Structure formats: structure tokens, C-alpha cells
From Swiss-Prot:
Protein's name in the database: Homeobox protein Hox-D13
InterPro entries according to UniProt: AP_axis_regulatory_Homeobox (IPR051003), HD (IPR001356), Homeobox_CS (IPR017970), Homeodomain-like_sf (IPR009057), HoxA13_N (IPR022067)
Record lineage: Eukaryota, Metazoa, Chordata, Craniata, Vertebrata
Record function comment: Sequence-specific transcription factor that binds gene promoters and activates their transcription. Part of a developmental regulatory system that provides cells with specific positional identities on the anterior-posterior axis.
Listed Pfam families: Homeodomain (PF00046), HoxA13_N (PF12284)
Molecular function as annotated in GO: DNA binding; DNA-binding transcription activator activity, RNA polymerase II-specific; DNA-binding transcription factor activity
Subcellular location(s) per record: Nucleus
Length: 284
């Protein structure tokens, strides 16, 4: 403006600077004394600074209550009870977070320190952790194989009480298309033909087999020959009770043991008593 003071006449300066900018009427400017361009510019700036008042701050509508949530897959999980307040959206109207509009779901600019219920947070954390990775319902123990407790139809019929079996003799084979990525196969298939082998030795098992045979029932009865029965009847007719020397002699003659001879004499006396008792009952 100062450079234009020497060449521009006063009437053109009046037309260049509008009367409204000086805050005075047009009549006063036309009737007043003439000023140079430099003086008039200084006065205009001072008067404009006095008359301009600070612009009021733009008022914005009260922030509406928003809800917090997160997207997983094609579903949206809302957390309405969580204490989150919106203090002002700093981002633009089309701001987005992970492909979803920010102004629709949550305000990432500032969050208040409102306490959140512990049950709600723990429940949401567990749910998100479950849907995020889809883990197994339980973790397998390395080095052990699960065996069902229920007995099989083709088994021996006794229940298996061992729930875990050591797999020290097994090595993993990896497969690309399998779920777990590896299966266990025995190193040597001809180690033990019977998986459930008893720790007892062979002699002990043999003795137990003999004991079980005796427990099943009486030993098979061996009938006496006619020669043996004739010799026993002859000695019984002589004496119903046998002595030690006589028992040895009969055992040698009949090729029977002394115990067999003794038992035969006992049974013979019982049989005679029965016969005598029947005869007495028949006699009137």
C-alpha cells in the first residue's frame, strides 16, 4: 500500500477501500480532509482491529451414546454394558478401522477410565480367545496314549483299568494331511505278541493253573479192578478195621496206595451200615 501512495490519486484510493471497512459513512469520507495512502492504511487496520470481535466457537450437538463391539467373521459382538463414553470424534466422517466405520461402532480417539465389570470382561475374553484360534477341548499328554476303560467284545471280558499307557517304545510318523500331524507306530512289531502280558513268570503261572484245576471239582474217580476188589473184600471179611501192617501188605498186593486202601475200608463200613439199617426197616 505504501508503494502505491505516490502514483494513485486520493479518489481512486477511496474507491479501492470500501467505506464499510473503515466503519464510517461515505459522507464523512468525502467531506473530510485528504489523507495519504500510508496514513489511511494505518487507520483502517487499527479501526478494523478494534471493531472485530472474536468469532464464537462452533457449537456441536451433544455426543450421542455409542456402543462398543468387535467383528469376528460375519458376526458382530456388542458390549453395551461396558462403560465407554465418547468425548469427541477427531477423525473424519469417513474414517474406518479394519474396514468398518469408526463413528458407527466405537470412538478410538479417547476412552474414559470407567470401571468395567469383571464378569463381563472375563466372559468376553474367553469367548474371543475361543473363536480366535479354535483350540482343542483338552491338551494331549505327550508320550501317552488314551485307552478306553470299557472292555471290547472280542477281549477277555475283564475291564481295563489303566487309562494311560506309556509309549516309550513308539516313534512318531508325520503325515501332512492328518489332523494332529503325527501318529504313533511301534518300532518293532514282533516284540510282544500279547500287549497285556502278566508280569508273573512261567513257573508261577503253571502252578496257578494246577491249583485252579483242583479247585474246579473232585478228581476223576478211578474204578478198582476185580482182582483188587476181591482182595479188599477178603481182608474186610476177616477184620473190618485195618491195621498199619495189614494196610501196607494190602497196598503191595493190590498195587494201591495206603490212602486208597484206608478210604476203601471206611466207605465199606458206611455201606454196610446203610444195608443193615434198610434190613431193619423192612422187618416188621
Amino acid at each position: 500500500m505504501e508503494g502505491l501512495g505516490g502514483n494513485v490519486p486520493s479518489n481512486q484510493c477511496r474507491n479501492f477501500l470500501s467505506p464499510s471497512a473503515f466503519g464510517a459513512h461515505h459522507n464523512s469520507l468525502s467531506s473530510g480532509p485528504a489523507y495519504t495512502v500510508g496514513d489511511r492504511t494505518h487507520s483502517v487496520i487499527s479501526e478494523s482491529a478494534k471493531q472485530c470481535s472474536p468469532c464464537p466457537a462452533p457449537t456441536s450437538p451433544p455426543n450421542p451414546a455409542i456402543s462398543y463391539g468387535y467383528h469376528f467373521g460375519s458376526s458382530y459382538y456388542s458390549c453395551r454394558n461396558v462403560g465407554i463414553q465418547q468425548t469427541g470424534l477427531k477423525s473424519g466422517a469417513h474414517a474406518s478401522l479394519a474396514g468398518y466405520p469408526v463413528d458407527k461402532y466405537m470412538d478410538v480417539s479417547s476412552l474414559t477410565n470407567t470401571p468395567v465389570p469383571t464378569d463381563e470382561v472375563s466372559a468376553r475374553a474367553k469367548e474371543f480367545a475361543f473363536y480366535q484360534s479354535y483350540p482343542n477341548p483338552y491338551q494331549r499328554v505327550s508320550g501317552y496314549l488314551d485307552v478306553p476303560v470299557v472292555p471290547t467284545i472280542s477281549g477277555h471280558g475283564e475291564p481295563r483299568h489303566e487309562a494311560l499307557i506309556s509309549m516309550e517304545g513308539y516313534q512318531p510318523w508325520t503325515f501332512a494331511n492328518s489332523w494332529n500331524g503325527q501318529v504313533y507306530c511301534p518300532k518293532d512289531q514282533t516284540q510282544t505278541p500279547h500287549f497285556w502280558k502278566s508280569p508273573l513268570s512261567g513257573d508261577v503261572m503253571h502252578n496257578q493253573t494246577d491249583i485252579n484245576i483242583y479247585r474246579r471239582g473232585r478228581k476223576k474217580r478211578v474204578p478198582y479192578t476185580k482182582t483188587q476188589l476181591k482182595e479188599l473184600e477178603r481182608e474186610y471179611a476177616t477184620n473190618k478195621f485195618i491195621t498199619k501192617e495189614k494196610r501196607r501188605r494190602i497196598s503191595t498186593a493190590t498195587n494201591l496206595t495206603e490212602r486208597q486202601v484206608t478210604i476203601w475200608f471206611q466207605n465199606r463200613r458206611v455201606k454196610e451200615k446203610k444195608v443193615v439199617s434198610k434190613v431193619k426197616e423192612n422187618i416188621p
